[in-house]
């Protein structure tokens, strides 16, 4: 397996980003006590849709429903009821563990009821580190409201269709690049 591309959506985008960190940063492996089954050399890229990349930013939003949901997700993910106060919360901030081994990544999110600011923060952080980032975010003035999980609406010619097209272009580009490297 030498052309692995990890995909994730919503919480799965966070998990996919963690898989990238495990493969590219031994410090992260030690911090969470998990060894990666894949190496950085095996990774060709990552596709991250609508994900939270800094779980601590999901706390105390002022919305009781979101706060309750976030508290339960954190508890399930980290195994501690008071997870907000534990050491593991530090490991949920993806950008704190990125290295120059981070593979090409496609990051996208809607602009309503999702994690757009976290996606933009991660994309900008990776760009500032010289990483290969393709991102797709939506201006409300041009696209209107684009919600969480928008990418599954691919038949309407709107944001979901654009995401599909951009994702295919990204995958083709990184696959061709990987193929050229291996020749």
Residue spans for each PLM region:
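Alpha/beta-hydrolase superfamily serine-hydrolase fold, recognizing
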Residues: 1-183
